UniProtKB/Swiss-Prot annotation:
Keywords: Blood coagulation, Cell membrane, Disulfide bond, G-protein coupled receptor, Glycoprotein, Hemostasis, Membrane, Receptor, Signal, Transducer, Transmembrane, Transmembrane helix. SUPFAM superfamilies: Family A G protein-coupled receptor-like. The chain crosses the membrane at residues 95-120, 128-147, 167-188, 206-229, 260-279, 297-321, 336-360. Residues 121-127, 189-205, 280-296, 361-377 are cytoplasmic. A proteolytic cleavage generates a new N-terminus that functions as a tethered ligand. This is Proteinase-activated receptor 3. The record marks 38-39 as: Cleavage. Glycans are attached at residue 82. The keyword DNA damage does not apply. It is a multi-pass membrane protein. One of its GO terms (biological process) is blood coagulation.
Length: 377
């Protein structure tokens, strides 16, 4: 039901009325906002932004707002402010972030490859389907990481083309929410197996697992469509670089759907699954007693899951909402570089998920014996 609601909202936000990009013009040929994905702000050459005159140093007159006109054809060559230029050329963006991505690639790529190899050799299907999909999502993410590493090491200069930029952006964000939803599905599966063993025993596990994973992938795909539909690649005149997703054209201004899109993404893609996971593991630990051999393993799995959500998912989703709220209401992008750092930490989940599989595989072995005992009793 949660994933179905998630998909419905995604479809609503992707409808023609809410997903058009670019600008509309009123009778005075003044730009009016439509939907676009917001990052750093960049202005086309020979254009002006809307700003209060009181912001000009030394201005003592009455406060007014200057209405500006955007070019009818959107320009791919942009100018950015000094703060954005400082971030794009800083060691944080060109050294620290790619160093973390290199670490994630070096650990996550072989770890998820080994996990997939072990899963394909496993004949049991109780948990294999969920973990296979989780490992595939992480593996795809690791495959695209070298492109982002090269991008940052090259001074945030993207050389792989618009299509590849959109594809890596979709996979980058899609991996996070696909992982979150699959971890929630795994926790529900374990909850039913331990807290409601008789109900779990009568379920068509393979069918439910395949349908659930298919719904997760479909939901995430629908929600990621705006990143693939809208332009992500822009050339920055001052620095002579081409950015990927990090800068957008200010003439593609935001609409209320912009804010609602990201709020719904964080709410249905992070908060609700996180609450479901907390409830499921709490109920499991409460049901099992300390003498049960599975109890300690579930404590470890719960702690690891909590670490994954706290370090990898919580910061980026919280900052995501704050950033886009500031962008919509105050037209500022000061938090975006903080959000990029949080996203960088979020990539660590691709390294931690394989260890969660190894923990849960131990639990599954004990659960198999437990269900056999229940069946014979």
């Amino acid at each position: 039901m949660r994933a179905a609601i998630f998909a419905a909202i995604g479809a609503l936000l992707l409808s023609p009325a809410s997903c058009q990009s670019g600008m509309e013009y009123d009778a005075d040929n003044l730009a009016k906002p439509t939907l676009s994905i917001k990052t750093f702000r960049g202005a086309p050459q020979n254009s002006f932004e809307e700003f209060p005159l009181s912001a000009i140093e030394g201005w003592t007159g009455t406060t007014k707002t200057v209405k500006i006109k955007c070019p009818e054809e959107l320009d791919s060559n942009l100018h950015v402010n000094n703060a954005t230029m400082g971030y794009l050329s800083s060691p944080l963006s060109t050294k620290l972030i790619p160093a973390i991505y290199i670490l994630v690639f070096a650990v996550g790529m072989p770890a998820n490859a080994v996990t997939l190899w072990m899963l394909f050799r496993t004949r049991t299907i109780r948990m294999t389907i969920f973990y296979t999909n989780l490992a595939i999502a992480d593996f795809l993410f690791c495959v695209t990481l070298p492109f982002r590493i090269a991008y940052h090491l090259n001074g945030n200069n993207w050389v792989f083309g618009e299509v590849m930029c959109r594809a890596t952006t979709v996979i980058f964000y899609g991996n996070m929410y696909c992982s979150i939803l699959l971890l929630a599905c795994i926790s529900i599966n374990r909850y039913l197996a331990i807290v409601h063993p008789f109900t779990y025993r009568g379920l068509p596990k393979r069918t439910y697992a395949l349908l659930t994973c298919g719904l997760v992938w479909t939901t995430v795909f629908l929600y990621m469509l705006p990143f693939f539909i809208l332009k992500q690649e822009y050339y920055l005149v001052q620095q002579d670089i081409t950015t990927c997703h990090d800068v957008h054209n200010t003439c593609e201004s935001s609409s209320p759907f912009q804010l609602y899109y990201f709020i719904s993404l964080a709410f249905f893609g992070f908060l609700i699954p996180f609450l479901v996971i907390i409830y499921c593991y709490t109920a499991i630990i409460w049901t099992l007693n300390a003498k049960d051999r599975r109890w300690l393993w579930y404590i470890k799995a719960s702690l690891l899951t909590f670490v994954i959500f706290t370090i990898c998912f919580a910061p980026s989703n919280i900052i995501l909402i704050i950033h886009h709220a500031n962008y919509y209401y105050s037209n500022t992008d000061a938090l975006y570089f903080v959000y990029l750092i949080a996203l960088c930490l979020g990539s660590l989940n691709s390294c931690l998920d394989p260890f969660l599989y190894f923990l849960m595989s131990k639990i599954t072995d004990h659960s198999t014996a437990y269900l056999t005992m229940v069946k014979l009793s």
